Amino acid sequence: MSHLFSKACQYFPGGVNSPVRACRAVNITPPIVARASKEVFVDSLDKTFIDFCGSWGSLIHGHSHPKICTAIRQGLERGSSYGLTSEQEILFAEEIFSYLGLETNYKIRFMSTGSEATMTAVRLARGITGRPIIIKFLGCYHGHADTFLQEKPFSHTSLETLDLAHPLTLSLPFNDFPLFQTVMNSLGHKVAGVIFEPVCANMGVILPVPGFIEGVIQTCQQTGSFSIMDEVVTGFRVAQGGAAALYHVKPDILVFGKILGGGLPASAVVTPKDIMDHLAPEGKIFQAGTLSGNPLAMIAGKVSVNLCREQGFYTQLATIEQNFLSPIEHMIRTTGIPVTLVRYGSLFSFFFNPNRPNNLADAQLSDIEAFQKFYQSAFSKGVYLSPSPFEASFLSAAHSMESLDYAQTALIESLEQVFSLV
């Protein structure tokens, strides 16, 4: 254990301020970051890592992008927080509406975290419908509110005394539309909203089967329940317009975060006006935040989104993904090792399972011990993947060919080592 991490353990539970950072799922001592730039970070022991976590997908442009850093420095001279509506909020809202192609009958509410945004989405759904039940899907993560922490691996982090929240939340298997439809046929009149990730990133990368997302939204329309699409991960990453644009759907409520803040804390709820105007002060459903719409986060976010709009940005990202991951897929296929590499829109996951998972139960069939050995080998070579078998890793526009070539070789060698192919 490093000296700094030992000191961190004196002050923070588990030495961290968010559980997965402790790296217990991969059985390593977590690095303590000293600095970061582009696609790499350097730890307190002066070891350099190629970063495929990127602040959990927030840094699609890499660490310390010069345009974002310059904008933040200039903005800081005008103040770090006002507690009042700022010009920066309005300018950023205009940028988002233009980027997403939102119609004029939409509105947005800025917040600071994804958890705040999903909590607000659920509060809107319950407040407007007067119904108690929220449906989510097993393995999908929507923040740390008790409403969402119903099943393992999250339930142990929620106080047992708050189990009263659980009867108001139903968790169903992802991608099982017949079961979802059966439940909605029975309980739909009590369901305020259904929240879902369009592409799962918190049980590894799991894609929706054809028709699942569309079916969920259509069923919500039929029962008068709100469809809540959590695009905290996929928004601004998988395409301009996010997953909603890719799947050609219009959920009632959209939730954004991560990339939205350009590396600073920012999130947002986006809905048609007739939904959003139920929020205070226009309506009676309360939501507030001291740092909501923080001017520095708005500035960083505006630059981040503007960079995503540059000509060929997503084509470049797709090329990076293809060049980096295709040779690894080829190695897995030709050697016949029991590993499945799932990728989508610059997200990717290694499942130590010969079959592509469709839900949490499938993902949990993976060989966790083999994943740990693979992860430890890659880590020792200076390749930092997201430190859990059930978390997505991320590519960024900042990943250079040199870094990708090195990491590709390191990951293939690590797979060979785990399965004794060398």
UniProtKB/Swiss-Prot annotation:
Q: Which reaction does it catalyse?
A: (S)-4-amino-5-oxopentanoate = 5-aminolevulinate
Coiled-coil stretches noted in the UniProt entry, renumbered to this chain: none
User: Per UniProt, what is one Pfam family of this protein?
Assistant: Aminotran_3
Residues that the record marks as modified (N6-(pyridoxal phosphate)lysine) are 258
Mostly located where?
cytoplasm
* Keyword tags: Cytoplasm, Isomerase, Porphyrin biosynthesis, Pyridoxal phosphate
| Keyword Nucleus carried by entry | no
Swiss-Prot/TrEMBL GO biological process terms: protoporphyrinogen IX biosynthetic process
Known EC number? 5.4.3.8
Which metal ions or organic cofactors does this protein require, according to UniProt? pyridoxal 5'-phosphate
Which principal EC class is assigned to this enzyme? isomerase
A molecular function (GO) term? glutamate-1-semialdehyde 2,1-aminomutase activity
A single Gene Ontology CC annotation of this entry is: cytoplasm
Domain of life from the UniProt record: Bacteria
Q: Where in the cell is it found?
A: Cytoplasm
What is said about its interaction partners and assembly?
Homodimer.
Similarity field: Belongs to the class-III pyridoxal-phosphate-dependent aminotransferase family. HemL subfamily.
Q: Which PANTHER family match?
A: GLUTAMATE-1-SEMIALDEHYDE 2,1-AMINOMUTASE, GLUTAMATE-1-SEMIALDEHYDE 2,1-AMINOMUTASE 1, CHLOROPLASTIC-RELATED
**What is the recorded name of this protein?**
Glutamate-1-semialdehyde 2,1-aminomutase
